[in-house]
């Protein structure tokens, strides 16, 4: 993974497992990443208990530091190939059922509700309204950027005031729902022979929030087959499109700022995300209200 280190364990009886190890305590992480290994373990267990989604089985989760200097967990191995590596080699007829099934799985994830909003593994930051939770998330990523002296297209202290006039649209979200928030093709594993989904991975960034926040709903374009599987058009209203734009802004901020924290070798992602950030601010400013 991009955050936790993952190791394949092969036993002499041919069984395979995956060991995931958290970064060391002194590793500089962004605020929203605190405690995300606990989130991954708990969300995997929750999805296994409450949905029909194929997710790995968690066999051990250890925070004692007795065997390793870091937190770790052991889960079942998911066979198959990441869909992002497979997609271009499949026909449209082969891709469509996989995308439809992804939409169906998202619907199952979002059926799981909670009493408060916020990042799954940070209950001390949870709030009773989505607007308050989202403002807190924005404040967190802006503080991360400020800590690392990362320049943004507008001054840090002007960012939230710039968005203030749009934030009321978040009040339409009243029921906290489980949001995977990282269900891109790289986290969907598929059997190359049967074209069936063998596993959904990497739910450590899960949160209790607005289902529309899933990147599948318009962050990187829209996939009609995913929407067909999901069964509801979440982007039907102007208010929803404004919420989507706010969520995009948050995502582009993370993708800009995380490059410094991750120490990426190139500036490719950062440059791309900066352009998206500029575009999104213009989109928001261009939204007309009656």
Q: What feature does the model see in each segment?
A:
Residues 12-14, 66, 193-195, 249-252:
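Short strand-connecting beta-turns/loops that link adjacent beta-strands
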Residues 132-133, 144-147, 171, 255, ...:
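Preference for well-ordered, secondary-structure-rich cores of eukaryotic proteins
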Residues 98, 151-163, 240, 268-280:
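Extended, well-ordered alpha-helical scaffold segments
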Residues 1-150:
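ATP-binding pocket architecture of kinase catalytic cores
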Residues 17-19, 27-29, 195, 207, ...:
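Membrane-proximal envelope and lipid/glycan-remodeling enzymes
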Residues 3-9, 19, 58, 107-111, ...:
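Active-site acidic catalytic loop and adjacent metal/ATP-binding pocket
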Residues 131, 143, 176-179, 184-245, ...:
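Active-site Asp-x-Gly
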Residues 255-290:
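ATP/Mg2+ or Mg2+-diphosphate-binding catalytic cores
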